[in-house]
Amino acid sequence: MVQLNQNFIDTITQELPAHLSMDEFIAACDRPLRRSIRVNTLKISSDDFKTLMQPKGWTFDPIPWCEDGFWISYDEEEQLGNALEHIQGLFYIQEASSMLPPTALFTPSAFTTSTKWQCVLDLASAPGSKTTQMAALMQNQGLLVANEYSASRVKVLHANVLRMGASHCALTHFDGRVFGEYLYESFDAVLIDAPCGGEGTVRKDADALKHWSLDDVLAISETQKALIESAFLALKPGGSLVYSTCTLNRLENQGVCEYLKQVYGDAVQFESLSDLFDGAERATTAEGFLHVWPQIYDSEGFFVAKLTKTASVPRLLPEPKLQKNFPFTPASAKQAQGIKDYFQQDLGISLPDELIMVRDDEFWLFPHEFNAFIGRMRFQRIGIKLADSSKHGFKVRHEAIIALAGKQLSPTAKTVDVSDVEAKEYLMGRDIPLATAGKAQGEVIVCYGGAPLGMAKHLGNKLKNNLPRDLVKDKVLLLPEQTKSL
């Protein structure tokens, strides 16, 4: 039974729209959430994913605000985080409401082929659901800066970015309040899914509101005001900003947006989201924001606001000095050609036309747009590591295969397709015996279902596992095929 603090009920009763009832709200909070996932279109189309999973008993109900999001039905005893297809990065387990902010930011009118955003900021990124959703919407083009304040959550963010094959990300680990100072008016678009009271999450955490207090809400809202101001300062004139929370009270939602409008006046223009998807008007506020109460769409509670920065605004602090000792240098023409030839001739992968950078014996691939950010802030991770070099040649890195061995694979690529059982063995760090012995082929890309799992060394009679030790799984779930379609 859900635990709703009486002080919370008293506050929300005053804020609940007239057409919604408190009884319906409480009943919705007490229902389990529907299971939802988002297909990772960096690796597979939604149609192909449905074709892959329907024989395994999955049914798909489209989420109206996310083209690649679905409520799913399946055997709920299965731990989907251990599923082979999840480990491969074919899908992300993501609550339906949390797919709203990237959708609101990347509306067709704001993101067209002729005016693609080059630099996007996700100010509070971990664990990575919205970051990887935006990476897919950007089709791994441009630069996506993903920031996370918590050190432990940066590791989770990095793991998810790699798993999903998001190659154009640069990760930072800062308090989000510094971005307006360090990267003033640098981004075409900014998403801030702000830390909040989490009132909308009660359907998956029955105790989320047990200790609710107005003092806590007031304290959190002050942090949110500082964050949205920093995000606004980091936004270019003409750019778009989406502010979202998974909470329900006005202080953390409309109140934060109204604060920004009070400070910056006409430079802040609220954009209506009433036409974002069919039925959006049911959650649209007078300002044009989306205030998603859990009973409206049978989802988590959520808030989403979108605004345009109509004019430049003065920066609050002097521009910081450029930082020195950036550890990467551009590859020479000879080095760049060497790594391109290795990927093309040995692996069958055409490297994208991006910056090839070198650090010691490491070769990296950076987005071109990152050039403008060198020295302006310290980055935890940039782009993808391609390979290490030695006197014997190059040694490809796992993350490069995961990010690049998809659409860039040529027909001559050295791949070995494995069964689901063999894929499970591979992900658990074991070598794969080959049914028919043949000539050793050296480095090969191991694939399952057309998507890469990683590298192995073809020794003629077996595939010697080259999966990085830190990615070896203790458990891999093979979802069984059903005897009849559902």
UniProtKB/Swiss-Prot annotation:
Task: Report the domain of life of the source organism.
Answer: Bacteria
What reaction(s) does this enzyme catalyze?
cytidine(1407) in 16S rRNA + S-adenosyl-L-methionine = 5-methylcytidine(1407) in 16S rRNA + S-adenosyl-L-homocysteine + H(+)
- Give the UniProt subcellular location, in the record's own words: Cytoplasm
Q: Which GO terms describe its cellular component?
A: cytoplasm
Active-site feature positions: 246 (nucleophile)
Q: Which residues participate in S-adenosyl-L-methionine binding? A: 124-130, 148, 175, 193
One of the entry's Gene Ontology molecular-function terms is: RNA binding
Per UniProt, the keywords (alphabetical) are: Cytoplasm, Methyltransferase, RNA-binding, rRNA processing, S-adenosyl-L-methionine, Transferase
Q: Where is the signal peptide?
A: none
One Pfam short name: Methyltranf_PUA
PROSITE patterns, alphabetically?
SAM_MT_RSMB_NOP
Q: Per the similarity annotation, which family is this?
A: Belongs to the class I-like SAM-binding methyltransferase superfamily. RsmB/NOP family.
| UniProt name for this protein | Ribosomal RNA small subunit methyltransferase F
The upper taxonomy is:
Bacteria, Pseudomonadati, Pseudomonadota, Gammaproteobacteria, Alteromonadales
Instruction: Give the gene that encodes this protein.
Output: rsmF
